[in-house]
């Protein structure tokens, strides 16, 4: 089911400008209280109503779900599709889900619901073929060889240049002779590769951290450039004990990657273009936070 872009407000440019001003005025204290409060989000009234009315039927499989069906990747009956925001992304997103990952606990489905034209979800061992594309595809995952987003273009360019060197080896010709021959034909190696490195696709892993090694060590992903979001912190309510707060949930990783890519690589001011990726996540975050707060108050209430 395609999600309608019609819910994107016509005054989005004005709203985005207001969001920028609001975010710039954000203080450290309020950020720690609610790190998601300054997002530029579509109205969540539809989620409030759905939460009050309870679980609803998936129109595809008939299952009873809250907000959306995590197996069919569609909103349920009491969450009209036209009231869900549609997010346009600058890159294609591939999510590789561990087979033992619990569907109902995963945030990967949020990305598919909100950016259906740009996001695909695969269940391991099903992985797309990336051979020959390692100069335009990166894997977001922390590790000793991982780089920061601001260095992505530099490392992709190095891979392009490396492929050019491989071409000389394949032709079994001395490099100088190869360059001279190409110049005579009016062809330049860099031009054949394009004006510069262009990232086209980003791969994310949807799994508990204890299960990720099986996927990251797969030979089909081993050659991809690894990128780490080193400065972002999670506010996921299922954060795994013993792991640093820089280990993000899947939807957080996708969102923060795109924001940092927009600023560091595209060199453009961020005006909330991708905030609606956290449409479901931010609502559930506040819902769970309030439930926990109410539970704590109930425990503190004196018994007479």
Swiss-Prot record:
Locations listed in the record: Nucleus
Ordered alphabetically, the record's keywords are: Nucleus, S-adenosyl-L-methionine, Transferase, tRNA processing
Motif DXTW — list its residue ranges. 206-209
Catalyzed chemical reaction(s): a uridine in tRNA + S-adenosyl-L-methionine = a 3-[(3S)-3-amino-3-carboxypropyl]uridine in tRNA + S-methyl-5'-thioadenosine + H(+)
Q: Name one GO biological process term.
A: tRNA modification
Q: Where is the composition biased (Polar residues)?
A: 15-30
Q: Where is this region: Disordered?
A: 1-30
Q: Name one GO cellular component term.
A: nucleus
Could you say which enzyme class this protein belongs to?
Answer: transferase
Q: Is the keyword Coiled coil assigned to this protein?
A: no
* Matches recorded under PANTHER family: NATURAL KILLER CELL-SPECIFIC ANTIGEN KLIP1, TRNA-URIDINE AMINOCARBOXYPROPYLTRANSFERASE 1
Reported function: Catalyzes the formation of 3-(3-amino-3-carboxypropyl)uridine (acp3U) at position 20 in the D-loop of several cytoplasmic tRNAs (acp3U(20)).
Q: Its family?
A: Belongs to the TDD superfamily. DTWD1 family.
Q: What is this protein's record name?
A: tRNA-uridine aminocarboxypropyltransferase 1
Q: Per the UniProt entry, what species is this protein from, by scientific name? A: Rattus norvegicus (Rat)
